[in-house]
Regions:
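Acidic, glycine/proline-rich low-complexity segments that act as flexible tails and inter-domain linkers
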Residues: 1-61, 112-151
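Short acidic alpha-helix initiation/capping motifs at coil-to-helix transition points
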Residues: 39-44, 72-80
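Residues at alpha-helix boundaries and short interhelical turns
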Residues: 55, 73-76, 90, 107-110
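Alpha-helical scaffolds flanking conserved acidic
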Residues: 59-64, 94-99
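Amphipathic, charged-and-aliphatic alpha-helical interface segments
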Residues: 61-76
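Hydrophobic alpha-helical segments of small multi-pass membrane proteins
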Residues: 67, 101-104
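Mid-chain, well-packed structural core segment of small domains
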Residues: 77-97
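Substrate/cofactor-recognition hotspot
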Residues: 102, 109-113
Length: 151
């Protein structure tokens, strides 16, 4: 068992999954860029409809594609959010680590170390949110991740 597998235990992960509502995540995540520049709304709507609300791709597969791309770009908060979404789509912490590792083989060893560090930080934040009184809604998780990954 690796350290990655020890950070977020099955019970807290289960609590996060029980509290997770995809529609809440989609609403929160699709409102940021258009709030900055309304011209992006059509672009964000197309992504939302095709990959987050539509049947084009299963959430687990979507996150298997996005996590290594974001890890290869040192994406910080965006990587953390997609690690969370991957876990909510039933990826295990170990699978996420494997995805980061495989992507890093092609993008550089620094991407492996930084990606795994981001996963550890994300899992730690998720464990803290799950342990806090008052539940672990999508909004609470995203807020905690934003605070933890503020630049």
């Amino acid at each position: 068992m690796s350290k990655i597998d020890e950070v977020l235990q099955p019970a807290p992960l289960g609590a996060l999954r029980t509290a997770y509502k995809n529609e809440d995540a989609v609403q929160i995540l699709s409102s940021g860029i258009p709030a900055l520049d309304g011209r992006t709304a059509g672009y964000i709507d197309a992504i939302r409809h095709a990959f987050y609300e539509g049947a084009n791709m299963q959430p687990k597969d979507r996150e298997r594609c996005l996590i290594p791309v974001l890890a290869s770009r040192d994406a910080g908060l965006n990587l953390a959010i997609h690690i969370y979404l991957g876990l909510m789509a039933l990826l295990s912490p170990g699978e996420v680590a494997d995805i980061i590792f495989l992507g890093g083989i092609y993008s550089g060893v620094d991407r492996i170390s930084d990606g795994l560090a981001a996963e550890m930080k994300t899992l730690t934040v998720l464990a803290q949110v799950a342990a806090a009184p008052g539940g672990c809604s999508v909004e609470q998780v995203i807020t905690a991740l934003r605070q933890a990954f503020a630049r």
